[in-house]
Amino acid sequence: MDVLYSLAKTLKDARARIVEGTLYTNVADIVQQINQVINSINGSTFQTGGIGNLPVRNWTFDFGTLGTTLLNLDANYVENARTTIDYFIDFVDSVCIDEIVRESQRNGIAPQFDLLRQLSNAKYKRINYDNESEYIENWNLQNRRQRTGYLLHKPNILPYNNSFTLIRSQPAHDNVCGTIWLNNGSEIEIAGFDSECALNAPGNIQEFEHVVPMRRVLNNATVSLLPYAPRLTQRAVIPTADGLNTWLFNPIILRPNNVQVEFLLNGQVITNYQARYGTLAARNFDSIRISFQLVRPPNMTPAVAALFPQAAPFPNHATVGLTLKIESASCESVLSDANEPYLSIVTGLRQEYAIPVGPVFPAGMNWTELLNNYSVSREDNLQRIFTAASIRSMIIK
């Protein structure tokens, strides 16, 4: 994997810098690196493809080295160099694709494609190494079972979950109290509702709680908390728990009270915030507990009082909501996030070439299903194929 990254980095730089009219002295270093690549791989033959609909392709390397000149690079020089560079880029791209579409239940962090294993041969160690990539650095650490670390922007750590639970309900669902939530990616929306607007709750205060487990520990997270849940606080037709009927959710928005957000690690509270909105910070956690209250307004104008009558029927649902977003965090495990297209690259290639479902990943690389059972085997394989995807992304930009 190191050789593949170094190849890609060298080729990317060469493609960008070796252009017509450039002084040779300004690109002499990258020309020497390209020549080192050529000398290392010349005489080798490789084969890619042969899995799913990925076509078999044979690769033969017999290229002359790039020459030197005292003048600017002319069109002939650049055309000759580009022919070599483009062939090598196509080769690296094919190797990346082959690695991305393979998986293994055992030692999934190690290269699975025979060709990539061949590139670890001592013959290719002369290729100029450049291991500045975060993915390459972490791949090397994981390969040695040492601690890794990824800085993530809006990490996709929460499996999709949209549901509700009722604290109180009537058969006709004309007097209900409960919570409704939507968890996905890096966002949690939670709303508490009560047809009676806490009329019969102790002290006219209805309490709600929502606990969200993470699939991995997050560290040094920046989190935002806002006192509303826009996706949930709209009129909606909701199925009953048994799925045999539906009921009308008709929310009237109130502001939540006594909001408390606790970040826990192994069941212990690490960071706790009370009655605070905006930007929060959490040191490390593997679950989040959110508690809040719906307080019946002690004084109401006639228009408001008409919304929340003292007796049935109760046409509306007094509703309070919160939105929590994990804006950034570090994690020892590889995850997809808002900054990187690697999950899309991996999923797209597997669909394009009709790669059969293997022993590790769910069909279609379903992210929710993958997270719900994020095993060590899945993590190892995901780190390897995301590393290959990061290399491919670099050369096809």
Curated annotation (Swiss-Prot):
Zn(2+) binds at residue 153. This is Intermediate capsid protein VP6. Intermediate capsid protein that self assembles to form an icosahedral capsid with a T=13 symmetry, which consists of 230 trimers of VP6, with channels at each of its five-fold vertices. This capsid constitutes the middle concentric layer of the viral mature particle. The innermost VP2 capsid and the intermediate VP6 capsid remain intact following cell entry to protect the dsRNA from degradation and to prevent unfavorable antiviral responses in the host cell during all the replication cycle of the virus. Belongs to the rotavirus VP6 family. One of its GO terms (molecular function) is structural molecule activity. It comes from the Viruses. GO terms for biological process: fusion of virus membrane with host plasma membrane. Ca(2+) binds at residues 266, 286. Residues 62-73 are annotated as: Interaction with the inner capsid protein VP2. The keyword Zinc applies. It comes from Rotavirus A (strain RVA/Chicken/Ireland/Ch2/1979/G7P[X]). The N-terminus is blocked. Sumoylated with SUMO1 and SUMO2. Sumoylation of viral proteins seems to have a positive role on viral replication. The VP6 trimer contains a zinc ion located at the center of the molecule. The zinc ion is not essential for either trimerization or transcription activity of the DLP. Zinc-depleted VP6 has an increased sensitivity to proteases. Homotrimer. Interacts with the inner capsid protein VP2. Interacts with the outer capsid glycoprotein VP7. Interacts with the outer capsid protein VP5*.
